[in-house]
A protein has these predicted regions:
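Catalytic center-proximal scaffold of phosphoryl-transfer enzymes
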Residues: 1-282
Length: 282
């Protein structure tokens, strides 16, 4: 599945905290990471892959994405800046969240700059929803026609904000530093306005973590991310995860016993036979 993912034109990426108790040379309190990678909403084959790493360094993503030459859509984490030979796309949902965090209670567009910034983001998403079903090329043209003027107005307005402080400063700084990446989607119709695709893919991990709390060993962490990759990819392709697991666990042992390098393309979640056998509701 990783090989298929790296061939796609767009990949979404994000990471979240993981506690692993028995990592060599580290205390249980030190944070590790689960890195998440997803195909785009427009991809024919939906892929969700998770990688366990001891670090949040951008080198983790660089190593995982070796050979990828497309567009990487992420939040504003600076670590992605070390990845070469890609185009980066930003996330307007994160931008909007920055304004929301800066908004005082009872804020309105008339009395709060944060509320005004939040409204700008809402206008962008309102137009974006209307363009969702357009082909890539047409969507890019329409974005430049309908959304670019809003973004131009947005950044002209940001320049009028004098000496912001606190969370308002954080929002303004994010907007300025991420401008190039926040504008990528205007010219690439295959790119979404937000990175919600991969954030949604991580929901199972985040919710599950509240129950299982930690992984005891690195081997357990590796096993967990493999399981999540299989299950979340199956779900993303409309499969019944239980049926899918039962099928591959029935087929794989005998196949690998005969040939450890056996082809498994017919077992990928989007294979026609797999869809027929394991689709939800069947």
């Amino acid at each position: 599945m990783k090989k298929c993912l790296l061939m796609l034109p767009v990949i979404h990426a994000d990471e979240t905290v993981l506690q692993v108790n028995k990592e060599p040379g580290r205390t249980p309190q030190q944070e590790s990471r689960i890195w998440a990678y997803s195909s785009s909403k427009r991809s024919k084959h939906q892929i969700r892959l998770f990688q366990y790493e001891m670090s949040r360094k951008g080198a983790c993503a660089t190593n995982f994405l070796e050979g990828f030459r497309g567009i990487l859509q992420t939040d504003g984490y600076s670590g992605y800046g070390v990845i070469g030979e890609i185009i980066r796309a930003g996330c307007w949902a994160h931008m909007r969240r920055k304004w929301l965090e800066a908004m005082p209670k009872g804020a309105t567009v008339e009395n709060s700059k944060a509320a005004k910034g939040y409204e700008f983001c809402g206008r962008i998403f309102d137009v974006e929803r209307k363009l969702e079903d357009l082909p890539d090329a047409e969507r890019a043209v329409k974005r430049q026609e309908l959304i670019k003027p809003i973004i131009d107005e947005y950044y002209a307005w940001i320049e009028t904000i004098f000496k912001p402080s606190g969370k308002l400063k954080d929002a303004v700084t994010y907007a300025v530093n991420q401008k190039e990446f926040l504008c990528t989607f205007l010219y690439h119709g295959e790119v979404e306005a937000s990175n919600n695709q991969v954030e949604n893919a991580q929901r199972g991990v985040v919710v599950g973590r509240k129950n299982w709390l930690f992984c005891d060993t690195p081997k357990g962490a590796e096993a967990s991310v493999i399981a999540y990759s299989i299950l979340e990819t199956a779900k993303a392709n409309g499969l019944n995860p239980e049926k899918y697991l039962m099928h591959i666990f029935t087929v794989l042992p005998d196949r690998f016993a005969k040939n450890p390098n056996a082809d498994i393309e017919d077992l990928l979640p989007w294979n026609d036979k797999i869809m027929e056998l394991c689709k939800l509701g069947v």
